[in-house]
């Protein structure tokens, strides 16, 4: 898998999969078996969706052939499974517009300015796009780009923090880990939370305590009420309210926010697709929506007898991939098996069975 730079010029795509959770990842696999290359878009900065974000360490017992695995473990297995098909990733981006074109293709644009012109679209958005909870304080939205980052991954956070005075805002394990990740690169690291208690595993909490005692990380208790900027929009300081209700000023160069994420249906409701109670209605033979070339799989769809299970989403993704392959071919295709089909084995990059 490889990231793709965003571009205002539409990139041609055989298929775009919206949502990089387990069902979206398996959709990429099934499309790959059909010879359909996929672009994969997700609002989160990493693949895995709800599994990786909300229950990475919780056991899952109902995946066929896997007696038990964690959410993160399942995501890692799926990443290995789709590796032969090298989907193009557009992470940290949300599809904000989708429109059918006169030639039957679908034009999609993302919040990062990426434009994709696709022959088919597979919506695997689960309960909606997981987007970071925003800081609600005066002046925050006007900050210059790059001075406030929501839920950046470790590499991005460390790179942005180099030589800077950094405030990490949040109280969960992601915030604690970000403070630990930045401590060697940053000029100063402060961990800001509304109280001096953090929800994290024992190991990172022990590291945090050791670095606090060494004076390398400072914990600040308070809530952001506003920001102070230079005339050019450069972030200079946070306005805080301490536990006693007194205003405080905290100078900084970079603000990293880890306030959790929440699912939002977002613009899907504006795409002209038939819906039933905020979910996409589908044909259960193909999992096509009301618009040709657009499919919906996983928790985002609804139909009689629907069960919101990962394994059901895998079944839906399989039928959707077969349906699109036949739509593009213009005729019914023979069923092939990975155990015996040299064509499928070649696509998977494995040696034919002897």
Swiss-Prot record:
GO terms for molecular function: ferredoxin-NADP+ reductase activity; flavin adenine dinucleotide binding; NADP binding. Signal peptide: none annotated. Its EC number is 1.18.1.2. Keywords: FAD, Flavoprotein, NADP, Oxidoreductase. Gene3D superfamilies: FAD/NAD(P)-binding domain. Its cofactor is FAD. The keyword Oxidoreductase applies. It catalyses: 2 reduced [2Fe-2S]-[ferredoxin] + NADP(+) + H(+) = 2 oxidized [2Fe-2S]-[ferredoxin] + NADPH. InterPro entries: FAD/NAD-bd_sf, FAD/NAD-binding_dom, Fd--NADP_Rdtase_type_2, Ferredoxin-NADP_redctase_2. SUPFAM superfamilies: FAD/NAD(P)-binding domain (SSF51905). Binds 1 FAD per subunit. Pfam families: Pyr_redox_2. The keyword Oxidoreductase applies. FAD binds at residues 42, 50, 55, 95, 130, 299, 339. Homodimer. Belongs to the ferredoxin--NADP reductase type 2 family. This is Ferredoxin--NADP reductase. The lineage of its organism: Bacteria, Pseudomonadati, Pseudomonadota, Betaproteobacteria, Burkholderiales.
């Amino acid at each position: 898998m490889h990231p793709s730079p965003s571009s205002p010029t539409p990139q041609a795509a055989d298929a775009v999969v919206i949502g990089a959770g387990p069902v979206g990842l398996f959709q990429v696999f099934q499309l790959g078996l059909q010879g359909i290359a996929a672009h994969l878009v997700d609002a989160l900065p990493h693949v895995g969706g709800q599994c990786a974000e909300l229950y990475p360490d919780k056991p899952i017992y109902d995946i066929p052939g896997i007696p038990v695995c964690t959410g993160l473990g399942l995501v890692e297995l799926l990443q290995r499974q789709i590796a032969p098909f090298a989907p193009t990733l557009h992470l940290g981006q949300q599809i904000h517009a989708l429109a059918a074109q006169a030639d039957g293709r679908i034009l999609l644009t993302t919040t990062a300015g990426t434009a994709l012109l696709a022959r088919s679209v597979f919506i695997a958005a689960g309960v909606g796009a997981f987007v970071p909870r925003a800081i609600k304080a005066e002046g925050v939205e006007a900050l210059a780009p790059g001075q406030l980052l929501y839920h950046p991954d470790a590499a991005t956070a460390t790179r942005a923090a180099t030589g800077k005075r950094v405030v990490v805002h949040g109280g969960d394990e992601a915030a604690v880990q970000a403070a630990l990740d930045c401590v060697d690169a940053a000029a100063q690291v402060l961990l800001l939370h509304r109280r001096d208690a953090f929800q994290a595993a024992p190991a990172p909490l022990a590291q945090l305590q050791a670095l606090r005692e060494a004076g390398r990380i400072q914990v600040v208790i308070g809530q952001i009420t506003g920001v102070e900027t230079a005339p050019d929009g450069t972030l200079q300081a946070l306005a805080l309210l301490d536990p006693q209700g007194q205003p405080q000023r905290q100078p900084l160069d970079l603000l990293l926010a880890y306030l959790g994420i929440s699912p939002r249906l977002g613009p899907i409701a504006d795409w002209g697709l038939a819906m039933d109670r905020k979910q996409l209605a589908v044909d259960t033979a193909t999992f096509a929506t009301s618009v040709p070339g657009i499919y919906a799989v996983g928790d985002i769809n609804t139909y009689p007898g629907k069960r919101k299970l990962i394994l059901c989403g895998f079944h839906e993704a399989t039928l959707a991939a077969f349906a699109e392959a036949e739509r593009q071919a213009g005729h019914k295709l023979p069923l092939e098996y990975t155990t015996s089909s040299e064509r499928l084995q070649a696509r998977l990059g494995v040696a034919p069975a002897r």
